[in-house]
Amino acid sequence: MAADNTGSKSSSAADSYVGSLISLTSKSEIRYEGILYNINTDESSIGLQNVRSFGTEGRKKDGPQVPPSDKVYEYILFRGTDIKDLQVKASPPVQPPASTINNDPAIIQSHYPSPMPTSGSLPSTASGSLPDISSHNGQPGQHGMGFQNAMPLYQPGGNLGSWGASPQPPMYWQGFYTPPPNGLPQLHQQSLIRPPHGLPMPNSLQQPLQYPNFNTPPPPTGSSSLQGSSLPEAPSSLFPFSTSSQMLAPSSLPFPGLPPVTLSSSLQSTLQSAPSPSLASEMAPPLLSNKAPITAPPTLPQDTNLLSFSLSTTRATEASTGLPLSNKPSVVTGPISPPQTTPLTSAPVAGVSSSISQDKPKPLLVTPGQLLQSGSSAVSLSPPSTNADKDVEVVQVSSSAGLEQSVPVTSEAQPPILPLPSSARPTQKPNGHSFPNHNGYRGRGRGRGRGAGRSHQVMKFTEDFDFTAMNEKFNKDEVWGHLGKSTTLDGDEDDDSPTVDEAELPKIEAKPVYNKDDFFDSLSSNTIDRESQNSRPRFSEQRKLDTETFGEFSRFRGGRGGRGGYGRNNGYSRGGYGGRGYGGYGGRGGGGGGYGYGGRGQGRGVSNRTT
């Protein structure tokens, strides 16, 4: 019992320092400063919020010194065994006792600004940033969260005045909203980034947010026409500034810490002609849902001008009503007729980042007939006035005629998006002959091609090849006579080629080329001749043997011409491209050393020719 009493006394004494400014030095000689959040005696841990590191400050004896850091950490949990020194630099501010006015059962809700604390620390400043919105007997709107046990995800607005001595870590700040006058439960608001009083908000965060939910009516103080109306309070960045605008005093706004809002004359007339606060009860049922309520059509009268709302508000309205986003044009402005079922469009204020308008989906490509059908449901707009708000950017005015001109007609014949393949486009040469990628080019003579420009295509066979019928059509005597003639013509030109006696030509006996009954046929007969002669066969013999075996080798061949025809020579008909090569002459126009030398420079072979 004595130990329990001692532990309870020590824990209560430690809890009394919660909210104090603590200077903590670790065993690594690094000093930290932050607000004491909790002390866990069981785990020997200390939690600080809004912690900043000041480095070693010259205390480290060995090794490099750790420089201070300007980064402020929201929460750090320290291990008690690694803490070298702990000092309390400032005690938590003394909370004034609760006023006795809250004990009156006739009071449903009270609202008064909290006094500014004297301490300059961040959490104590945050504790006095928002007015006290607490109500009597803990109404259902209060989000009761145990700050001693868990880290809150957002700052609840209902129990700002009932924290006691333990301020919360400022993880997220809540947006503008005030409880309705009839004591409705406070809703789950979107986590808008709103810094505490006295902390500046970056400009990059002020523009894209645009305050999606600003439709909750202010508390019924009745001090001015703005607070008595049911119009939502809107931030000053949503309204265009004009020369005839009027300034609202900060005292007339529900939050005294806010900057004065500049409103144009059209908005002021709207506020003065707005309905009475009795509409607040009519707006209560939509507030009970988690969806974003429809803001503009129920509250604005029909004879007023719609000011420029942000694009996020329009999106929230369309998300709650289930209307499509693709039917609306990009951005429009102008007076709007009585509320309809079509989505509202808006114009951005000058200075708002253009990334908001880029997020909107673009309209699909449709025909003019479809535009005429969808144009009947568009919001009727008149041309924008030029003498009023001149700093509003008019990006596009919506009308069915304008959309018809901007959308191309898809039924017209259009050129292909991608260019045609290079093989399908024959190139016209200056000499009148076309050479599509050198496919099907048949060189003849000295580079003047005879090809008809046909592209090389792969033949598709539908039946098996008939060898017997093709053998009957093949006339070997005609081919051999043609070869003999070419040999005689070329014999006079080259005296260095080896001489072959005509008497030696008929040494090879005529044998059938293919015999099904024999295992060996005439295809392998040259090995017997080589064994008998013990030397390489002569060129004329080899050429005749190859002709009998394979026929005219390069007659229907399109490729690169082979090694100079059929002789075992050094002729190279490189790049014949369909040239006719006979023997070792490389073909006519196909390269090689025969007559018709070099079809467009596609072969420079030299072959050993016989007489």
Swiss-Prot record:
Phenotypic consequence of gene deletion: Seedlings with pale and weak cotyledons, characterized by disorganized veins. Impaired mRNA decapping and reduced P-bodies size. Altered transient seed storage proteins (SSPs) translational repression and degradation during seed germination.
A single cellular component GO annotation: P-body
Ranges annotated as biased composition (Basic residues): 441-453
Pfam families (UniProt xref): FDF, LSM14
Record domain DFDF: where: 453-489
Segments forming domain Sm: 9-92
Listed Basic and acidic residues bias regions: 528-547
UniProt keyword Transferase present: no
Region (Disordered): 111-153, 183-238, 264-301, 318-362, 396-455, 519-611
Its biological purpose: As a component of the decapping complex, involved in the degradation of mRNAs. Promotes P-body formation. Translational repressor.
Subunit description: Homodimer. Component of the decapping complex. Interacts with DCP1 and DCP2.
Protein name per the record: Protein decapping 5
